[in-house]
Amino acid sequence: METLANRLDACQDKMLELYEKDSDKLEDQITHWHLLRVENALLYKARECGLTHIGHQVVPPLSVTKAKARNAIEVHVALQQLQESAYAHEPWTLRDTSREMWDTAPKGCWKKRGITVEVRYDGDESKAMCYVQWRELYVQNYSDDRWVKVPGKVSYEGLYYTHENMNIYYVNFKDDACVYGETGKWEVHVGGKVIHHDAFDPVSSTREISTPGPVCTSNTTPASTQAQVGASEGPEQKRQRLEAVDGQHQQQRQGSKDSTQKAAERAGGQVDSDRTRLCDTRSAHPVRHPSDPDCAPVIHLRGDPNSLKCFRYRLHHGKRKLYSRSSSTWRWSCESENQAAFVTLWYTSDTQRTEFLNVVKVPPGIQVILGYMSIF
């Protein structure tokens, strides 16, 4: 027990030295969070051994030290990844890398240079609320977990930043408008400027993803053109024209279907009807065909993005032989930023996946979804 007390004293002495140093280097902040991990691990072990005091220090309950250790691990891993980015040599203080800053909206990223944004609901100064707009935000890409710096923005709708062609709102003024206001309108005061409801552009402020896709070559006439043509036609002419357009659309759909099937046959031989049924999106529970050699067993891990990254990091360094490949953290594009993320694990066989589930303990809060995916 004396050794435990000495280690705890040495750990806390090093932390005090860092506090007095007040460094703005990222490596010192990483050291600080490493020491916090060690401190909570020692306190956890002391409590496990039945100690309630170490010298004059009270040993917290196991649940408290466990939660603090998890928080320290999460921030420590995030800072280690940040050190490998292009922003490692920027000034990083204890305040910039604190757990409070990590949890401040938007959660799970680093922020700097905050300014105050005042929102007056109903245009009434007595109903004003203040928010923080971060001029610089450091977020991770969903595709490769690489850190990038993006500017914080403000619109009539709320506070947001643009990442991977998507506007991500972390404060929506509409949510507070029904609490602090009555008319559902407000004014945004920032940097000596005022944003009114009349200046709100719902198109440019709407959160959306720009994804490449096929160019639409439909021959459908725009609604305005149809209205102009229909005004000069009689009922019989309208019916004949609509029948002709409908027949043309059916031919286009049939031609598109045939060309898709022929392309599949050219790429992979004869199209298997059973394989086609497996890819039927109308089925709630698709079943893998036993004779299909092109499907690999997978596990989709669903949960908090940061928890998934920490869990994947532990798997990569301790259980790498129990799975074939792992994906980066990803989300469905139609879901909001607050929705859960996914990490997909690939396996060479069902036996390997079963062994993984028998050996690896999945942390609470992470959902395991079994499935199969086409090998590519």
Swiss-Prot record:
Domain of life: Viruses
Record's subcellular location: Host nucleus
CC per GO annotation: host cell nucleus
Presence of the UniProt keyword Metal-binding in the record: no
Gene Ontology biological-process entries: DNA replication; DNA-templated transcription; regulation of DNA replication; viral DNA genome replication
PTM comment text: Phosphorylated.
Region (Transactivation domain) location: 1-206
Family: Belongs to the papillomaviridae E2 protein family.
Descriptive protein name: Regulatory protein E2
Organism of derivation: Human papillomavirus type 10
